[in-house]
Regions:
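Conserved class I S-adenosyl-L-methionine
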Residues: 47-75
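Short alpha-helix
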Residues: 87-105, 109-111
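A short glycine-rich, Lys/Arg-flanked "PGG" loop and its adjoining helix->strand segment in the class I
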Residues: 32-47
Length: 163
């Protein structure tokens, strides 16, 4: 349980991976506790990776799949998901992540779109030659940190250093 790592001493790891828990935490206290524990077990100067599911690509996917009306009771008037456990995933916008992180003594190194649009092109990737795929990956790495492009990703990765 990422919210309580009391079986781990403080300041012991050079790298901490929080890859998954934030997808399934629905209240601010739980989110804060998970980040707090990741920061606590990380050494000063260590790196923490925290992954999030993107709100707006999910909204787009619901439109494309003609399913948005099925979830209107879980979406506010600004199309921000009101996530709850029975829906499985908590969805975030960058401002949500920034709000969660605001109270921690950390320095953001990178905020990236982890998969960008690859979720939409599963079959196309299977059909690519190695040369095409390598070129796509070069493109992916060129755009994955661009602030105007991160919103295209289904998953975001916040990489920060403990001060």
């Amino acid at each position: 349980d990422a919210r309580n790592l009391n079986f781990i001493e403080s300041d012991v790891y050079d790298i901490v991976l929080l890859l998954g828990p934030m997808y399934h935490l629905y209240n601010d206290e739980d989110k804060h506790n998970a980040i707090s524990e990741a920061v606590r077990v990380c050494k000063a100067g260590g790196i923490i990776f925290a992954a999030y599911c993107n709100n707006d690509t999910t909204m787009h996917q619901l439109f494309v799949q003609h399913k948005l009306f099925d979830y209107l009771d879980c979406i506010d008037n600004q199309f921000h998901a009101i996530s709850k456990p029975e829906l499985v995933f908590e969805l975030y916008r960058k401002e949500d992540v920034d709000r969660i992180m605001s109270g921690f003594d950390v320095y953001r190194l990178h905020y990236v779109g982890a998969d960008m649009l690859s979720n939409c092109f599963d079959e196309a990737f299977d059909e690519m030659t190695d040369e095409e795929f390598n070129l796509y990956m070069k493109y992916h790495y060129a755009i994955c940190e661009r602030e105007d492009m991160i919103g295209l990703s289904f998953h975001m990765l916040d990489i920060f250093r403990k001060e």
